[in-house]
């Protein structure tokens, strides 16, 4: 199980500049990812989502999401007590 689903999310978390991610989004997403990685219960992930996380419909395995800002979302799976396959997505 990989903590990150793609290179963009890994770069953002590790502070590597990406032209396709605004700096303010990258900073906020990195903080949220840190919270997701530290979570030991799914309920802990609500802190990253400013009190809200949502289960995405029709996903297998179940996938959850929390808003980073505007059209930017973090999606992740919850498996064996931790967030995995975390991905920063631009839905715009």
What are these regions (language model features)?
Residues 1-32:
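Arg/Lys-rich, positively charged N-terminal/basic patches that mediate binding to nucleic acids
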Residues 8, 17, 49-52, 84-87:
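Glycine-rich, flexible loop/turn motifs
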């Amino acid at each position: 199980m990989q903590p990150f689903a793609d290179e963009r999310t890994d770069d953002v978390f590790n502070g590597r500049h990406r032209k396709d991610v605004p700096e303010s989004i990258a900073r906020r997403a990195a903080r949220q990812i840190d919270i997701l990685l530290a979570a030991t219960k799914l309920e802990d992930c609500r802190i990253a989502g400013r009190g809200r996380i949502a289960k995405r419909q029709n996903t297998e395995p179940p996938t959850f999401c929390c808003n980073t800002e505007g059209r930017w979302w973090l999606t992740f799976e919850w498996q064996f007590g931790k967030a995995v396959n975390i991905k920063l997505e631009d839905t715009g």
